[in-house]
Amino acid sequence: MNPVAGDDVVVIARDVTKRFGDTLALDHVSLDVHRSELLVLLGLSGSGKSTLLRCLNGLHPVTSGTVDVGGTRVDQASGAQLRALRRRVGFVFQHFNLVGRLSCLENVLIGGLGRLRLPRYGALTYPRHMRAEALAHLDRVGLADYADRRADTLSGGQQQRVAIARTLMQKPALLLADEPVASLDPENAGVVMDLLFRVCIEEKLTVVCTLHQVDLALGWAHRLVGLQGGRKVLDRPAVGMTRDDVMAVYQRVEPAVTPARRV
C-alpha cells in the first residue's frame, strides 16, 4: 500500500531515484519530514541536495519512487494538481528571485497571487486585507520600514528576508529553501537562519533547507540528512551531533567551534 501523509507527517518520500540522462542524481532516497520540523540537507555540490528539494514539489519529476506531500502524490500528480500543490509549498531561492524594480511590499504581495482570480498591477490593486497581511509579514522579518523601497536597493540579507516574507504570504504548509544563505555574509546568514527557525516553531511550518555551512546546520536544524553521490548516508537529530559527525558526509574533518544550539 502506498504511504499517505498523516497529520504529523508532511513529506513522505520512498526510494526516490532521479536520472538526468546517464547521470544518477538520486539513488533510492527515502525520507519522512514532520510538521514543525526544520530539516537540513547537507552534502557536497552535486550530492543531490537541490535535486531532492525540487523532486518534493515536482519541479523535477522522479525517475522512480514515490513522493507524497500533504496527501498529494507528487509523482502521479497532473499539471493542475501540481499547480495547486505549489500554492501550498513555498520556495526560497539562493538568489532571492525578487522583482528589483518593484517595492518590497509589492514583492511580498506577489506571494498571494495564487489566492486571486486575476493578476494585479501595483500594491493598491490588491484587496486592503492582503496589503495589511503583506505589511505584517514585512514587519515579521524586520523590514516594515522598507515597504515602499525598491527591492534592488536592499542588501542581500534584506532581500532574502523579503523573499521569506513573500513565501509566508502564500500561507504554505511546507517551505523549501535552496541554499538560502550561500550568498550572504556570516552575520546575515545567521539572521536568515534564525528567521527560518522562528517561523518553523511559531507557525508550525515544516522547513526543508539545503546548506553547505555545517555550523549553521548544527546551530539551527532539528534534524540533519546527509547526501553523498545521490545516496542518503546520514539521518539523525541534530541534538548531540558534533561537527566531526557531520563532516563524515564530506569525507573530511575541519576543526571549528560548534555554536550553541537555539532552543
Swiss-Prot record:
Database matches in Pfam families: ABC_tran
Annotated catalysed reactions: phosphate(out) + ATP + H2O = ADP + 2 phosphate(in) + H(+)
Annotated localization: Cell membrane
Transmembrane stretches, start-end: none
Membrane topology type: Peripheral membrane protein
Binding site for ATP: 43-50
GO molecular function terms attached to this record: ABC-type phosphonate transporter activity; ATP binding; ATP hydrolysis activity; ATPase-coupled phosphate ion transmembrane transporter activity
Main enzyme class: translocase
Domain ABC transporter: 11-254
Description of what induces expression: By phosphate-limited conditions, via derepression by PhnF, and probably also via the two-component regulatory system senX3/regX3.
Classification via Gene3D superfamilies: P-loop containing nucleotide triphosphate hydrolases
GO biological processes: phosphate ion transport
Record keywords, A-Z: ATP-binding, Cell membrane, Membrane, Nucleotide-binding, Phosphate transport, Translocase, Transport
EC number: 7.3.2.1
GO cellular component annotations of the record: plasma membrane
InterPro entries linked to this entry: AAA+_ATPase (IPR003593), ABC_transporter-like_ATP-bd (IPR003439), ABC_transporter-like_CS (IPR017871), ABC_transpr_PhnC (IPR012693), MetN_ABC_transporter-like (IPR050086), P-loop_NTPase (IPR027417)
NCBIfam families per record: ABC_phnC
Description of how the protein assembles with itself and partners: The complex is composed of two ATP-binding proteins (PhnC), two transmembrane proteins (PhnE) and a solute-binding protein (PhnD).
PANTHER family given in the database record: AMINO ACID IMPORT ATP-BINDING PROTEIN, PHOSPHONATES IMPORT ATP-BINDING PROTEIN PHNC
Family per record: Belongs to the ABC transporter superfamily. Phosphonate/phosphate importer (TC 3.A.1.9.2) family.
Chain's role: Part of the ABC transporter complex PhnCDE involved in phosphate import. Responsible for energy coupling to the transport system.
Name the UniProt record assigns to this protein: Phosphate-import ATP-binding protein PhnC
Gene source species: Mycolicibacterium smegmatis (strain ATCC 700084 / mc(2)155) (Mycobacterium smegmatis)
